[in-house]
């Protein structure tokens, strides 16, 4: 199980990403406009740099909702491989069957 502080830090990052999503998209769209001059583009870039570092979606890390484990993450379930295996064996994941061929 991951430390509670790491899980909370990740939740804080998710809140920051949501809070600044619109502003970040607007700034990036304005910077991508080919009709603006270089000085305006530099000003937009400076505004983008002033946003909190943790508000960038790149800094998010997928974590298991059950254990908080950051590695071996399955997006379809939101679980790490260990929790996925355990829950599948118990029959807690609908539609998941043990493979045989």
From Swiss-Prot:
Gene Ontology cellular-component annotations: cytoplasm; small ribosomal subunit
One of the GO biological process terms: translation
GO molecular function: rRNA binding; structural constituent of ribosome
Purpose of the protein: Binds 16S rRNA, required for the assembly of 30S particles and may also be responsible for determining the conformation of the 16S rRNA at the A site.
Keywords annotated in UniProt: Ribonucleoprotein, Ribosomal protein, RNA-binding, rRNA-binding
Gene3D superfamilies xref list: 1.10.287.1480
Classification lineage: Bacteria, Bacillati, Cyanobacteriota, Cyanophyceae, Synechococcales
Protein's UniProt name: Small ribosomal subunit protein uS14
